[in-house]
Structures are given as structure tokens and as C-alpha cells.
Amino acid sequence: MRFPRFLAASATLCAVAFAAAQSVPVPNAAPSNSVQIPAAPAPAGASAWLLMDFSNGQILAGANPDARVEPASITKVMTSYVVAAEMKAGKIKRTDQVLISENAWRGGGGGTDGSTSFLPLGSMVSLDELERGMVIQSGNDAAIALAEHIAGSETAFVELMNTYAKKIGMNNTNFANPHGLSDPNHYSTARDLALMGRAMIRDFPEAYAYNKIKEYTVNGIRQHNRNGLLWKDTSVDGIKTGHTSAAGYCLLASAKRGEQRLVSVVLGIQTDSQKQGFDLRENGNLALLNWGFRFYETRTLYTPDKVIASPRVWKGKDNTVALAVATPFSVSLPRGKFDALKANIDLPKHVIAPLAAGQKVGTLKISLDGKVVAEAPLVAKVAVAEASFFGRLWDGFLMWWDNL
């Protein structure tokens, strides 16, 4: 009710604004066994690499994360993402029959130097089979056929790829084709590729599950998944290999152990030995994943149902508004460090109505040893309508007085 607040404010002719920055308790911050953390194992020969926590996108370790690289067939993760998004929108179905055009056959078929699903020219293949061929065997012909089926041409499909990439947050990426063969306008970064892998797992888990299939048979030809980590570690369930002479040997990987999932990417390993290239990209990723699981832990600190602050609302029908995070807010830290966390909230001096439910009002910042390690927007849990004319007028006067 505004009337009691009006009386209290009238008595003092002044209102104390909610603090611009306040400390708040950090839940789920009980200490765990502290361990001495060695440096992350840099993958041998890699020009860029990165390890990311899946739940929050935090980078745990990396080198040259924003250096421009050729993604090679890791590109096909974005092709898969577009396929899944278009399927979710009801524009295509797994049962669709897709024509293998001359463009798909010549650009990615058995007569090319790239990886292929050996799809016969002029044949009709189900969309589901094409997706398997692209994800498991890395078939360039399958990628082109999918692109043509969805958008009518590779060029139009690439526009979709770049549109979705920007939505994911891949700000330093540009795709020029759906398969990843070298092109001057086809590039990405380790950070962007990790974000892409994270988005694929998060947004389309059913489509992502294709990445852990070890082999399949099409046209009488048994084809194996090129991600050798699927055989080396049962916690690994994806995601995509890549290789061209310019890109080197590359691998974007993910593993889940318990409730923790990590995403790793190793790029740009140059060697004339295919076996060595395979081994280096696999062992480099596996070492990063093992290091991350051993020395880091991830905890959810706040959930949307937890009210973190209730600042005063000016010019509103309600005196206060409950603030919370919009989505579960987790933090990844070295083991044993959670008890040292500090949480602060940044709010404007005056929170002014009207406020919509879900509207950002402030920011929650989590710090360790004086350094901000994670932050999230604080949003209004409920809407707050404007007060009456006289209520707004009175609060306007009090805000003026408070600013003197």
C-alpha cells in the first residue's frame, strides 16, 4: 500500500534510496577440498585451443581464443544447428526425401578429395540419413544436399547459418559454405566454435545425440565416426572433427561426468601424418577435459525462484519489487574456492515504475579475490504499475530532495 509509505515519507521529507551496490549472501558456497591447480595442459601443436564450462560459458583455460582460424568440418555443427532449428520450426521433417543434385554430388561426392557419404547422383535420400551421413561420417555431399533442401541453394543456406551464428553470439565468425572446405570468407575462432558447440547441446539435445553414434551403414558401406574420443573415453559424447591442409587437424569435443559438462576445442595442428594429427587432436582435447573435471567444479548459486533483493520502487503502486536471476546462475571455480566468493548487486539509485515482469533492473556480480568472475542480470519477478498522479508527483519531489 502507498498510504503508509506516504505518511512515513511526509514525516521525514526525505527518502533513502536503495544502495547502488550491496552485498548479498552467496548460497551453496560451502568449502570443498582445496587442491593445488597446475597450469592447463596446452595441446601440442595447436594454434588455438580453449576449455569452456557448458552450464555458464565460462572459459577455464585457453590460448589465442579469438584468433581467426579455418574451422574445416567443424562447420557442420552449424549446419546441424540450422537443420534442427528449421525442423523445430516445422519447415522440414526427418522423413523428407531429398534429391542428391549434381551440385551436391560434384561438390562433395566420392570423386572429391573431401570427406563424403558416397551418395549416388540423382538418388532420393531421407533427411535423417543425410543428417547421419554429415554428422557421423562428415559427408560434404550430405551437407550440400541438406542446404539445398532447406534453403534452395548453398548461398541462401549460408545466410541462415550466419544469422543463427550471430544469435548464438559468434561475433567473429563468417560462414561461406555448409561443409567447411577452405574459402577466404570462411572463418571462426576457438571461442566462437565452443559457443557453437554449447548452443548445439543446449538448444537441440535430440539432434546433438547423433554425434555419439560410432558408426552406421549406408549403401552397403559401413562408415565410422571420425571422432576417436568416442572410443577413448565413455564420458565423451561429441562433437565434431575437422581437417583441411589450411586448417590443420581440429576437434571440437564435449564430455559429461556427473552433473558437470565441459566443451573443449583444439585447432590448427599441422602435420603430414594423418595418424599423428588424429592422435594430437584427440589427446589434446582429452587432456584438457581431464584437467577441467579434476580441478574445477561448477555450482548453481541462484535460481529464478530465489529472491535476491527487494529494492524500493519509486512512482509505483507497490513499495518494492522482488528481483531474481532470469535463469539458473552457475559459477565454475577451482575446487576449494567457493567459500571465498563474494556477491554484490548493482542497482540504479532510483528504481522507477512502471516495471515489466522480466525487465532487467540491476546486475548480480560474483567476485573471487576482488575480481569479478561471473555476472548476471537481475530482473523483476512481477510487474509494477505506475502510481496515481499525486503518488508520482510526491515521489518525484522526494527523488529531487534525495538528489540534493
Outline where the language-model segments fall.
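Bacterial N-terminal signal peptides that target proteins for export
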Residues: 1-11
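N-terminal signal peptide c-region/cleavage motif recognized by signal peptidases
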Residues: 14-20
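Structural motif marking the loop-to-transmembrane transition
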Residues: 3-4, 71, 127, 386, ...
